[in-house]
């Protein structure tokens, strides 16, 4: 059995007109800071506790001069945080048996950026769960921007953009 945990930042530019029906047994709440969370049993992925941070920010909020910034920041979050300097965040998750790109990933869309990782239930004990929540916390308020990582990510994102260029 798997557990799916999602945390969403408030964003009111596109309010939901009809509430989304959640599966029975879903625990839903809102913290005093506005963070909306869901905890639910999820059969897929099997034997995993999946964490998702859904930030309601994407390319729609960018000006012409900021084009690509949301995607760039998505990449930078894996390059170091307050509690997980440099690549130690990815290294920690990989030490639990996860694979970067498969079990650890993120993407930026038109109106949201989603970070996710799936902790194997073999490792989903108190310490791993605490550290998983700390990762979500750091992604919200603890990303460090290393100039070396910035230069490296520029090249990666430019290559990704070339892959999407229709010309």
Give residue ranges: language-model regions.
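Bacterial N-terminal signal peptides
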Residues: 1-10
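Residues embedded in well-ordered secondary-structure elements
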Residues: 4, 18, 42, 104-106
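Boundary at the C-terminal end of the N-terminal hydrophobic targeting segment
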Residues: 13-17
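Proteins with a high burden of low-complexity, intrinsically disordered sequence enriched in S/T/G/P/A and R
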Residues: 18-19, 32, 93, 167
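Mature N-terminal segment immediately following signal peptide/propeptide cleavage
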Residues: 19-54
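Active-site-adjacent, His/Asp/Glu-enriched structural segments that form or flank metal-binding
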Residues: 55-70, 74-167
